Every structure is written in C-alpha cells, then in structure tokens.
Regions:
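Catalytic core of pol beta-like nucleotidyltransferases
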Residues: 1-55, 64-75, 79-128
Length: 128
C-alpha cells in the first residue's frame, strides 16, 4: 500500500481498500493507549471515502471534551504509538502526525484532535 507524502509534495492516487484497514489498525492502537471511547475516533478525509482518489495520508479525527485536556499524558500516549504533536497553529484543533522515516520528511497519518461535539468535528465528518 502506498502511503505518505513529503513536505510540499502533491499527489493523488487511486482508492485503496487497505486505507480502511490501516485506519482500523491505528484506531485499535489509539484505543489501547488513550482513555477514550470508540466513538471518539473516526476516519476522515478523502481516504475515508470508498472509491475516491485521494492524497495517500490517513486522516483521523480524535474528539476530546476540550482542547485543554490535551496534556503531556495524552501526548506521551500518542508518541508511544508513533505520533508527534505538530507545531501547526489551528484554532480549536491540535494536530499530530506519524512519519514513515526517521528524518521526519514523509507524513503517513494525521490525527486532528478537536472538541468532541464542536463545529470543526461536524465539518470534518460532513466532508466524508
């Protein structure tokens, strides 16, 4: 399965049914290390839409009660399964990424942590 993009790289690839399996695999890992319900983790973005061409990056939504609860414990838990908090500044969203290489050049997964019942979550789910 082709997965990942380098910084500033743009690539659209044909739909791959393995994207769903990869999301499910990562979701299980997240459920194992985080104190969240299954309903708080969802596959979003173009790889979540069956049959659609997409950028080969798995986007995952993590719904939290509030963004202030994203503390060192949650960051360490996500780090333990290979995710790094990005310095991306987005209002009402914290972004984590997983990389395919030790040089942190090729991103394969994003976790978008947003308020569980907030507007951003609704917009991200609506796209799907």
């Amino acid at each position: 399965m082709e997965l990942g993009l380098k910084k500033d790289e743009v690539k659209i690839v044909p739909y791959n049914a393995q994207w769903k399996s990869e999301f499910e695999r990562v979701k299980k890992l997240m459920l194992h290390v985080l104190n969240v319900n299954e309903s708080q983790i969802e596959h979003i973005g173009s790889t979540a839409i069956k049959g659609m061409k997409a950028k080969p990056i798995i986007d995952i939504l993590l719904g939290v009660e509030n963004l202030q609860c994203i503390d060192r414990i949650l960051e360490k838990a996500l780090y333990s399964i290979g995710f790094y908090r990005l310095r991306v500044e987005r209002e009402n969203e914290v972004v984590f990424a997983k990389f395919a290489d030790e040089g942190f050049e090729t991103k394969t997964h994003f976790i978008h942590a947003v308020k569980f019942n907030g507007k951003i979550k609704k917009n991200l789910i609506f796209f799907r």
